[in-house]
C-alpha cells in the first residue's frame, strides 16, 4: 500500500495499492468534463480506488455521489480515500455493476460516469496482475454491460459521461444508442496541437434527441512542451 499523494498542493489526496495504476490523467480530465453537468445524484461505475469519485465530490459538494466496484480491495480503498478527503464513504458499493437491477433502483441518478477498461478482453499485452488487468481490459465489464447499466441507472433526460480511446469511438456510440443514450457532446484530448487524439471525452443523454456538439480539442501541452493554461487550471497549478 502506498502513502497518500496530493493531486495538487492542499487538494484531494489519494492512497493507491502497490501494483495498481497510478493517478491517471484520464480520470482527472473526465472529472473536469463532467463537473459542469447539472446533477444532484451521481454514480461512478467501476470506481476503482476512487480518483474520479473523490474529484467529483470535491467539485460538486452539493451532490450525492456513489460508486460501485467489483474488486473488494479497490472498493475498500475508495471508501478510505473518500473518508480521507472528508466525504461520506457509505455510498461505495462492493459489487458487480452487471447486477445493476439487484444493486440499485432504476432511474435513480442524474449523472452516470465511468472511466472503463479500454481494451477488449484478451487484446494487447496482458497486465501482470488481476487488479491492473481488470482496469485495462473488459474481463468484468464490456461496453454493452456499461451502457446497459448506465441506461438503467440514469433518469430520463439524465447524462452518461465517460472517457475512452478514439479508436473505439464508433463502438462507444453504437453501444450508447443501442441502449437509448444519445451522444450529445464530444471532446478529443491531444498531447499537442496537430497530434492525433489519444483520449475522447463523451457525454450522452438518455432519451436525448439527435445532434452532437464537437468541442474544441483539449490540448495537454503547448508548442514549447509546457502544460497548457487549461491543464494548469484543471490541476490548480
Provide a role label for each language-model segment.
Residues 196-237:
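SAM/dcSAM-binding transferase cores
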Residues 15, 66, 93, 184-187:
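General small-molecule cofactor/ligand-binding pocket signal
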Residues 116-145:
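Mobile active-site "lid"/loop adjacent to the S-adenosyl-L-methionine
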Residues 12, 40, 63, 90, ...:
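A structural micro-motif
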Residues 32-125, 148:
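Conserved SAM/SAH cofactor-binding pocket of Class I
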Residues 140-191, 195-197:
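Conserved Class I SAM-dependent methyltransferase catalytic core
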Residues 1-37:
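Class I SAM-dependent transferase core
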Amino acid at each position: 500500500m502506498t502513502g497518500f499523494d496530493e493531486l495538487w498542493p492542499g487538494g484531494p489526496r489519494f492512497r493507491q495499492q502497490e501494483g495498481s495504476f497510478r493517478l491517471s490523467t484520464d480520470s482527472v480530465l473526465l472529472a473536469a468534463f463532467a463537473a459542469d453537468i447539472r446533477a444532484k445524484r451521481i454514480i461512478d461505475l467501476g470506481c476503482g480506488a476512487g480518483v474520479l469519485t473523490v474529484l467529483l465530490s470535491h467539485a460538486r459538494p452539493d451532490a450525492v455521489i456513489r460508486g460501485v466496484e467489483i474488486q473488494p480491495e479497490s472498493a475498500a480503498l475508495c471508501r478510505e480515500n473518500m473518508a480521507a478527503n472528508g466525504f461520506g464513504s457509505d455510498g461505495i458499493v462492493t459489487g458487480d455493476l452487471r447486477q445493476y437491477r439487484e444493486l440499485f433502483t432504476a432511474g435513480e441518478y442524474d449523472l452516470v460516469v465511468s472511466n472503463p477498461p479500454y481494451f477488449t478482453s484478451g487484446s494487447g499485452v496482458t497486465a501482470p496482475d488481476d487488479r491492473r488487468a481488470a482496469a485495462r481490459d473488459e474481463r468484468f465489464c464490456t461496453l454493452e454491460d456499461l451502457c446497459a447499466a448506465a441506461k438503467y441507472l440514469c433518469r430520463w433526460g439524465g447524462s452518461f459521461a465517460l472517457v475512452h480511446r478514439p479508436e473505439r469511438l464508433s463502438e462507444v456510440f453504437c453501444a450508447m444508442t443501442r441502449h437509448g443514450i444519445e451522444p450529445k457532446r464530444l471532446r478529443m484530448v491531444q498531447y499537442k496541437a496537430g497530434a492525433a487524439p489519444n483520449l475522447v471525452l463523451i457525454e450522452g443523454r438518455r432519451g436525448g434527441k439527435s445532434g452532437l456538439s464537437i468541442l474544441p480539442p483539449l490540448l495537454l501541452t503547448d508548442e514549447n512542451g509546457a502544460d497548457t493554461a487549461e491543464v494548469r487550471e484543471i490541476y490548480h497549478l
